[in-house]
Amino acid sequence: MNRILSRAQMRAFDRHAIDACGVPGVVLMENAGRGATDVLEREVLGGDARGRRVVVVAGLGNNGGDGFVLARHLLLRGADVRVLVVGDPARFVGDARVNVDAFSALGRSFETVVLREPLERALADADAIVDALFGTGLDRPIAGLFASVVEAINAASAPKLALDIPSGLDADTGQPLGVAVRADVTVTFAHRKLGLCTPRGAELAGRIVVADIGVPGSLLGEETAAFTFDAADAARAIRPRPSGAHKSSAGDVLIFAGSPGKVGASLLVARGAMRAGAGLATIATFRDAAERLDARVLETMTATIDDADAAESLEDRVDALLARRNAVVIGPGFGTDAKARAVLARVLERYPGPIVVDADAITLAAREPELLAPARGRLVLTPHPGEA
C-alpha cells in the first residue's frame, strides 16, 4: 500500500525531513526537480529531451523553484528551455532563490509574464509545457493574471506536465480553486496527495507519477490521510496455501445478497470471494430470488433464508446459517424491506467475525444508525458516493 497525504501532512513530512533528518530543503528541491525532469523526458518527450522546446511557467514559491531545477536539468540534457515567471522575480527567496540563481549561472535568462498574449505566443511554439505555478500550499482561489495564465496553459495544444499537483487544484479536496491546470501528466513528490485521488482531481491531474525525493516514508510514522490499495496489494494480502490445503481450510464466506432483478449482485460478490481465496462461498437469499439463482452458480452454494421448517423463526434460520463461517457479506441487491432489515439486525447482533456491510445494508443502516450499535464483529463499510 502507498500512502496518500493531506496538505498538512506533506508540510510536516518536509519539515521533519529538514529538521530531524538533516536533509536541507534545497536538496529536497533538487531531488524533486531532477525526478520531474526524468518523468518529463520519459513520459512526455518520448525518452529524449535533446532539441525539444519546453516552456516552464513558474510561480514565485517552492513550486517555481522546482521548475527552475527542472529547467536547469533540461538544459544539461540538450533541450531548448524557456522559463516564464509570473510575478515579481525579486520575491524569490530561500531554496527557490538558490535555484533561480543556479539556472542564471548557466548563462540563461528568464522572462516575466505581465500580459496573457505574449504568454500564448510562447506556449504555441512549445513541444511541452511545465506547470510550476502553484503547489500544494495553495488554499485560495486563483484570480487576476494568475487565472489568465492557467487559462492560457489549458488552451495551448502542447502536452502539459504539472509539478506536484496541477496549479489551482486544492490538495485536500481535489476541487479547483477558481481555475486549475488540466495536465496530461502530474509528477507528485514523495507521496500522492489526497486531492489527486478524488474524481475531479484525478481528471485534472492526468497520468500520475510519484517521484522519490530521497526521504524514507517511515518519517511519517503511522499517520496518513489514506492509502492506495491495488492488485499487487491484494495479491500480497492472500496467504500462500500449503500443499495439503482443501476447500474447508481456506475460509468459508456467507453472502446475504440478491433479490428479484438483482440476482447478479450476489453472483458478483460470490465470484469475488472465490477469487480472493475463499474455499467455500454460500449465497443466502430469499425464496423468490433463490429460484432464479440455482441455475446460474457452479462452485458457489446457495441457501434460502425463508424456506426452512415452518417452526423455525427467521432469526433461528439466520443463526444456523452463520454457524462456523469465517466472514459475512450483507447487502448487495438484498433489498431494504422489513425482512432484509430483520436479517441485517440479526447478523449484526449475533455474528462475532468480520462483516462487510454494503449496498442495501448501508441504506438500512443510514435510515437507522442504531442498527450498527450492537454489532459484535469488525465492520467494513463499502459505500459508493450515493450511500456515503
Predicted features along the sequence, with ranges:
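Nucleotide and nucleotide-moiety/phosphate-recognizing core
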Residues: D38-L133, P141-L163, V343, Y351
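Positions that flank functional sites
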Residues: P89, P118, G168, D288-A289
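Short, conserved catalytic or adaptor-binding loops enriched in Gly and charged residues
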Residues: V100-G107, V179-A180, R200-E203, L372-A373
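Internal gly/pro-rich beta-alpha loop/helix module
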Residues: A126-A128, L133-A225
